[in-house]
């Protein structure tokens, strides 16, 4: 159920962007965004409560099922709005089958992010370590 919901959530997020890019207004999108949010919350609740699938499997499945229903309802709303706006272009789900493809699709510049992390580790972390040493708060240093 979790995988079904994750695929549907990804689709409705991209489909919502497609409609934004084709002229949908905030007022038109408001009910659909509420459904997407409800769906996302349910996925997040189950996914972030690490032991839920073991300790409360029926409740976890119920939450994921509810999330899927909200996501499918959101997709239906998006399809109706697309027709209402007379958008001729077809929505094409991007290929996000790998982490690299997904990162590229959302515009994440990995080399830039890696460079920023390297700079952070080189400049900021040593200052934190030095300050912790001065204040006697450094328990261990690797």
Question: Where would I find each of the regions flagged by the language model?
Answer:
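Primarily the internal scaffold of c-type cytochrome electron-transfer domains
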Residues: 1-114, 118-120, 124-127, 132
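Extended, compositionally biased alpha-helical segments that mediate assembly or anchoring
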Residues: 134-142
């Amino acid at each position: 159920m979790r995988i079904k919901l994750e695929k549907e959530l990804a689709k409705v997020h991209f489909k919502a962007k497609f409609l934004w890019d084709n002229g949908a207004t905030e007022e038109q999108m408001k009910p659909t965004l509420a459904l997407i949010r409800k769906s996302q919350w349910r996925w997040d609740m189950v996914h972030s409560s690490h032991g839920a699938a073991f300790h409360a499997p029926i409740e976890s499945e119920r939450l994921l099922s509810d999330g899927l229903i909200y996501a499918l309802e959101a997709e239906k709303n998006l399809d109706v709005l697309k027709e209402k706006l007379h958008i001729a272009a077809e929505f094409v789900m991007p290929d996000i089958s790998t982490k690299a493809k997904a990162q590229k699709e959302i515009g994440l510049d990995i080399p830039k992010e890696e460079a920023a992390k390297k700079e952070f580790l080189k400049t900021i972390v040593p200052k934190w370590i030095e300050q912790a040493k001065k204040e006697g708060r450094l328990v261990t240093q690797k």
